[in-house]
C-alpha cells in the first residue's frame, strides 16, 4: 500500500 495503488485507488462499488 503506497499512495495510489490498487488498495486505495480501486473502486468499492
Swiss-Prot record:
Main location group: plastid
Subcellular localization, as worded in the UniProt entry: Plastid, Chloroplast thylakoid membrane
Membrane found in the keyword field: yes
Record key words, sorted: Chloroplast, Membrane, Photosynthesis, Photosystem I, Plastid, Thylakoid
The keyword Lipid metabolism appears for this protein: no
Domain of life: Eukaryota
Topological type in the membrane: Peripheral membrane protein
Record-level GO cellular component terms: chloroplast thylakoid membrane; photosystem I
An example Gene Ontology biological process: photosynthesis
Protein function: Stabilizes the interaction between PsaC and the PSI core, assists the docking of the ferredoxin to PSI and interacts with ferredoxin-NADP oxidoreductase.
Family: Belongs to the PsaE family.
Name this polypeptide is given: Photosystem I reaction center subunit IV
Organism, scientific name: Pisum sativum (Garden pea)
Lineage: Eukaryota, Viridiplantae, Streptophyta, Embryophyta, Tracheophyta
